[in-house]
Amino acid sequence: MTSQPLRVGIGGPVGSGKTALTLALCRELRERYNLAVVTNDIYTQEDAEFLVRNEALAPERIIGVETGGCPHTAIREDASINLEAVDQLNRRFPGLELILVESGGDNLSATFSPELSDLTLYVIDVSAGDKIPRKGGPGICKSDLLVINKIDLAPLVGASLDVMDRDARRMRGDKPFVFSNQKTGQGLDEIIAFIERQGLLTAA
């Protein structure tokens, strides 16, 4: 176990499935690791309340941050409010191994400050159309893992997963991506394996 927890940033546009992924990760990882969560919303603590309501973790392990402005700023240019939440969790739970930091919904230009996140997951969803991967932006091109979510909606919105696969490979080079459906859990094992492998986590 390292002296500092692994911090995993989870970003992506509004409605892409960040909170659903955070919930799924908590449910799968809470028995393996000493785990906590920070969520970001502009004017509310809605995502934190959702996680508490769904018993993702004990309530005291979840901190909801109200950014009061552009969610991008709170995870990149001035991450102090999030860094304070991380410090608070570290003080509250000595020996923390993993902190998930979920950003507020933002556009394709959002990225995490390296001061705040050791690994970044960027979540997009199929319902926005199969053109999204080729639009690029730091989240799509530079995140450690791109999660293409809600693949069950592809036939309903006329999106081609083959096109998204091709464009994701072209935009990301050697960086990995995964197709997922949080309703069924598809892709979750791959996401967890990535976090454990890249974050050098060893389950108790």
Swiss-Prot record:
Gene3D superfamilies associated with the record: P-loop containing nucleotide triphosphate hydrolases
Gene Ontology BP terms: urea catabolic process
CDD domains: UreG
A Pfam family: cobW
SUPFAM superfamilies listed in its UniProt record: P-loop containing nucleoside triphosphate hydrolases
SMART domains, alphabetized: AAA
GO molecular function: ATP hydrolysis activity; GTP binding; GTPase activity; nickel cation binding; zinc ion binding
Keywords of this entry: Chaperone, Cytoplasm, GTP-binding, Nickel insertion, Nucleotide-binding
Localization per Swiss-Prot or TrEMBL: Cytoplasm
Residues that, per the record, bind GTP: G12, P13, V14, G15, S16, G17, K18, T19
InterPro entries according to UniProt: AAA+_ATPase (IPR003593), CobW/HypB/UreG_nucleotide-bd (IPR003495), P-loop_NTPase (IPR027417), UreG (IPR004400)
GO cellular component terms attached to this protein's record: cytoplasm
PANTHER family xref list: UREASE ACCESSORY PROTEIN G (PTHR31715:SF0)
Complex and partners: Homodimer. UreD, UreF and UreG form a complex that acts as a GTP-hydrolysis-dependent molecular chaperone, activating the urease apoprotein by helping to assemble the nickel containing metallocenter of UreC. The UreE protein probably delivers the nickel.
The family this protein is said to belong to: Belongs to the SIMIBI class G3E GTPase family. UreG subfamily.
Function statement: Facilitates the functional incorporation of the urease nickel metallocenter. This process requires GTP hydrolysis, probably effectuated by UreG.
Protein name: Urease accessory protein UreG
UniProt source species: Pseudomonas aeruginosa (strain ATCC 15692 / DSM 22644 / CIP 104116 / JCM 14847 / LMG 12228 / 1C / PRS 101 / PAO1)
Lineage: Bacteria, Pseudomonadati, Pseudomonadota, Gammaproteobacteria, Pseudomonadales
GN (gene name): ureG
